[in-house]
Curated annotation (Swiss-Prot):
Residues 20-63, 97 form a propeptide. The three-dimensional structure formed by the three intramolecular disulfide bridges is indispensable for effective bacterial killing. Host-defense peptide that has antimicrobial activity against Gram-negative bacteria, and to a lesser extent also against Gram-positive bacteria and fungi. Exhibits antimicrobial activity against Gram-negative E.coli and E.aerogenes and Gram-positive S.faecalis, S.aureus and B.cereus and the yeast C.albicans (in vitro). Inhibits corticotropin (ACTH)-stimulated corticosterone production (in vitro). Inhibits enzymatic activity of B.anthracis lef/anthrax lethal factor (in vitro). This is Defensin alpha 4. The gene is DEFA4. It comes from Pan troglodytes. Keywords: Antibiotic, Antimicrobial, Cytoplasmic vesicle, Defensin, Disulfide bond, Fungicide, Secreted, Signal.
Length: 97
């Protein structure tokens, strides 16, 4: 009877040792799938009619502009900064023909 109890205890310990790394791998997987702030891109576009376009400064008239997280795209020109919710973004514009 003692031999069966000892063998059962050894078997349980062996199963716990094997299950431990599986749980650790399962905990790591969600962290690997999360995207960091450097991967995120925010784009906010503005559209207006001609009457309100007269109120816009001449430097951005005839352009489509967006607030980007860090850098402008290759076809865009950095015009300034956007402040949204207390966070500063890069203000990028491209010409509309």
């Amino acid at each position: 009877m003692r031999i069966i109890a000892i063998l059962a205890a050894i078997l349980l310990v062996a199963l716990q040792v094997r299950a431990g790394p599986l749980q650790a791998r399962g905990d790591e997987a969600p962290g690997q799938e999360q995207r960091g702030p450097e991967d995120q891109d925010i784009s906010i576009s503005f559209a207006w009619d001609k009457s309100s376009a007269l109120q816009v400064s001449g430097s951005t008239r005839g352009m489509v502009c967006s607030c980007r997280l860090v850098f402008c795209r290759r076809t865009e020109l950095r015009v300034g900064n956007c402040l949204i919710g207390g966070v500063s973004f890069t203000y990028c514009c491209t010409r509309v023909d």
